[in-house]
A protein has these predicted regions:
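N-terminal FAD-binding dinucleotide-binding subdomain shared by FAD-dependent oxidases/monooxygenases
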Residues: 1-120, 166-268
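Glycine-rich dinucleotide-binding loop and its adjacent helix/turn
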Residues: 44-47, 104-170
Length: 268
């Protein structure tokens, strides 16, 4: 179910114990698949696969209850019940679901947005979206030696990393107007009692360091983001984080990694 988008060098942004359901802890991955308690994403995939198989309600597992290839036509509430009219995208058969509760997870970015590239019909190699990266043979094919990745978000950084680890020659393309490089790079290391950066970020104090509508509007958040002293303090904090990240990455001194210095962010 979840395997198609995974690949060998795909790592999580979360750590052991933070991405599991309370009724089924996730087994700890082997140490070779861990880095400051971040781990290869394939272990989350396996965990979710197992979870859908072992949880059963009224004689049906979660896997039995998941329906793929279904398009929702309408949602109505009649006599206190939800009525969901759907069609199967493969054979156009209609089906109506009835439920006492409805959760909408619209997945606004679940449909791949493929750019139109001039002359792509004359290009001899495969052109794929990140969605198909894991199920493709791009990383394992000996005939594919050069890979170009378009875009600067996390998924692009993941693909660049995976391609380099697979021994490919990689070109990373950004828009001319994008002067800051990849979306976000951060050292995984923790400080004090925290083993990694994720654990620090999950604390209530650290969560207030980034402006968010999710945070409550308190004197503390107004001080940090609404006063000149707070803005100066936050600027100093993030400058320190940026400096430490650059030091850990050592972009400019890895002589055996050609082009690694070009990954250095161009933060103003």
């Amino acid at each position: 179910m979840f395997v198609g988008r995974g690949y060998e060098y795909f790592w999580t942004q979360w750590t052991i114990g933070s991405a599991e359901f309370s009724d089924k802890p996730m087994p700890r991955p082997p140490e070779e698949d861990l880095y400051y308690d971040f781990f290869k994403a394939k272990h989350t995939t396996q965990y979710l696969e197992n979870y859908t198989n072992v949880h059963s309600h009224a004689g049906q597992t979660l896997r039995d209850r998941i329906k793929f290839g279904i398009e929702v036509l309408s949602v109505d509430k009649l006599d206190g019940k939800w009525v969901i009219s759907t069609t199967n995208i493969d054979d156009n058969t209609l089906h109506t679901f009835h439920a006492s509760k409805l959760m909408v997870a619209s997945g606004m970015t679940s449909v791949p947005n493929m750019p139109v590239l001039p002359g792509q019909e004359n290009f001899g190699g495969p052109i794929i979206h990140q969605e198909a990266f894991g199920s493709s043979r791009i990383l394992t094919s000996p005939d594919i030696k050069t890979i170009t990745v378009l875009g600067g978000a996390k998924s692009s950084a993941d693909m660049v990393y995976a391609a380099v680890k697979a021994g490919k020659t990689v070109t990373w393309v950004f828009k001319a107007s994008d002067t800051t490089g990849p979306g976000f790079f951060l050292s995984p290391k923790g400080k004090g009692p925290y083993k990694n950066a994720f654990d620090i970020g999950m604390t209530r104090v650290a969560a207030t360091f980034t402006p968010s509508f999710i945070n409550s509007d308190t004197w503390w958040t107004r001080l940090l983001h609404g006063s000149k002293y707070g803005v100066k303090l936050m600027g100093s904090f993030w400058s320190t984080v940026d400096k430490e990240t650059r030091q850990d990455a050592d972009f400019e001194h890895r002589k055996n990694l050609g082009g690694f210095k070009d990954l250095k962010p161009h933060t103003p």
